[in-house]
């Protein structure tokens, strides 16, 4: 029988991977090779998902701001330009929250942007 020189390390690695694969269906939670492939894929997808989440939220905020500004008679790009010219430094997340929760305050911001664009 061949000598195994890395039994402790291999066992430790296998246990770690199988622990991460707990709850997966069938062989993906029982067999090391398939479990390892599934865990690697899952970790990669979760990493990518964390990066995509930032993009997705920014797109959502911009869509909300755009909808609210068009209700008040202005486009998103002109609104953002007017806000910057007015020296109002509010990020898109806060602007979208204001647009949803306080329509009157958002309408006031749109008016400020319109004045700056006309000036």
UniProtKB/Swiss-Prot annotation:
GO terms for cellular component: ribonucleoprotein complex; ribosome. InterPro entries: Ribosomal_bL20 (IPR005813), RIBOSOMAL_L20_CS (IPR049946), Ribosomal_protein_bL20_C (IPR035566). Gene3D superfamilies: 6.10.160.10, Ribosomal protein L20 (1.10.1900.20). It comes from the Bacteria. SUPFAM superfamilies: Ribosomal protein L20 (SSF74731). The keyword Cell membrane does not apply. Pfam families: Ribosomal_L20. Keywords: Ribonucleoprotein, Ribosomal protein, RNA-binding, rRNA-binding. One of its GO terms (molecular function) is structural constituent of ribosome. Belongs to the bacterial ribosomal protein bL20 family. This is Large ribosomal subunit protein bL20. It comes from Clostridium botulinum (strain Eklund 17B / Type B).
